[in-house]
Structure formats: structure tokens, C-alpha cells
Amino acid sequence: MAAGFLSALFPQVMLSEASPKAGSQCVFRGHSTGCLYLVDALAGDPEVLQADAETYYGELVKKSSSIPDVFSIPGGEEVKLEESCVYFVPLYRNNPTCKMLLLTDPKDKETVLAVYLNQCWWPVEDVVKTADPSRDGLISVQTFGERIVLFVLNYIIFGMLEGSSANDAFFLPHSATECAKIFWRNGEAVAFYSVKMKGSLCDGATSQCYLLPVLDTVFVRRKYRRSGLGMKMLDDFCQSFVAEDALGISCPISAAMYQVCQKFLQTYPEEQKRLWEVEAPGDWSQRVNIWLKIQMESSSSGRR
């Protein structure tokens, strides 16, 4: 495992203010007002945070008068807080006990509006923001708050809000120990990639382990695509494992990712022999050299 890949980069920051009223709406505006976003402020035991969410959900079901009735969507519209619009989903793959409470649009249950944490509702777009100016570029996922950001980017923003393209592959929630990096730009999480480490288990059903580091999932938010972020993440992945003779990218590779690979390998020809499209666990019978495949497909297209 590369030493720098999993280094601790930012400590968790405790909120100095008193806890908000259960079920309230959090709108944090950054350092200029002394406030922090969720990833900057979230600390404490995840089990306690989940217990808070379960308590809140129970009060919501009972229609307790102690919790707010509506959630204000950024832009002014209000959504009534009721049981039919709120549900739990697993935070991690293969771990149903750790759950996140989500609020959906009553007009479209596939649209998630907010996440419940720290005794308040956080609009989805606020969850992926930071007020910490040092949180910039690619940063390893370490804290529980960063795990939440990864979940929102992967499961909600990609899986529900921006995942309609036929070229995209559906991303399941990651495991609790998934090796991943989030790309931060201008105070916002705009992309991420995750890696299956060499020697890690392929899944919980077998004893097979990955035979090489594998770039497993890559996602860039739509408004930040075509700006070179895919190239930057692929380069960072390769630079994180300079001692490895072979690196994998999980099969199947999307058409958009193939374009990134082609441009990357043209720019860095020294990596052409190292990058392989692989199926787990990645032995030689499960590998196809990506550069060779690109050349063969280009040659085939030229003969048509």
C-alpha cells in the first residue's frame, strides 16, 4: 500500500456551537461567518449519529410537534417533512447496519434533496462543499465526514441525480475501508476515484485477492467534465504506485474513460505497458493491455 495514499491529511473539527434542534435545517456559509460545512465540522461516533437519525425518524413517523414540518429547498420552495419522503439506505456496501437517512422530492422519489446528520438536514449540494481553503486538489478519504462526501458523490449525485447517461456504469456504495480520493476545487467536491489495493479481497464471497492495484471507480460531476480531471486522476493513480509493473482499470471501461486513457497514454507513453483492463482478481488470463486494445480498435476502424 502506497504510504502517501492513505496518509491522514485533515483532523476532524468539532463544532463550538451548541447542537442544533433535532430536524432543523443546516445552512453553513463558510469561514467568513465562523461557520463550517458538514465535512469540516462532523465529528463524534458514527453510531451515535445514526442513533440520532433513528430517533428523529421515529419522531417524524409519530408526527411529533417538536420537529419542523418543512424543509426549504435552496431556491425558496418548501417540502413537507413526512414519512413517505424519508427513508434509510446503507452507507457502506455489505454493511446494512450503518445507514443514512435521506429526504426525497415528493414529486420524484428518485431525486434526493437532503441528508440527515448531526441533528439537522443538509442539502445535497452543501454536503459536498468545504470552507477549508487547504482542502484543494486530490485528497485521500480519511474521516467519517469525507466518507459521507464520497457516499453523496457516488450513490446520490452519480447514482440518482447525474447517472442517466448510457455510457455511465452504476456505482454501488463503497465499503467502509475503500481506498479513495476526492478531487476538491473551489470549495467543492467535484470528482473522485477509488482503488482496489493489491492483496485486498475481491469480495466477501470468495477468498480471492487482487493481484495488482486496480482503479475501480472514477466519477467527475457533469459541470466539471472536459476539464482534464479524468487525466489528473489517472495520472495520480499511476504515480501512487510507481513501483508496480502492472496497474489495472476495472472492466468494463466506459467509452468516456477509454477516451481519457487514450489521451493519457499518448501523453505518457511510458505508461502504455503498465495499464490493463482487468477482471477480478486480475491474473494474466483476465487482463487486456489498454493501449494495445486502443490501437487494435483504431486499426479496425480504419479498415472499414
What kind of region is each of these model predictions?
Residues 1-212, 238-304:
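Terminal substrate-recognition subdomain of acyl/acetyltransferases
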Residues 217-239:
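Conserved acetyl-CoA-binding loop-helix of GNAT-fold acetyltransferases
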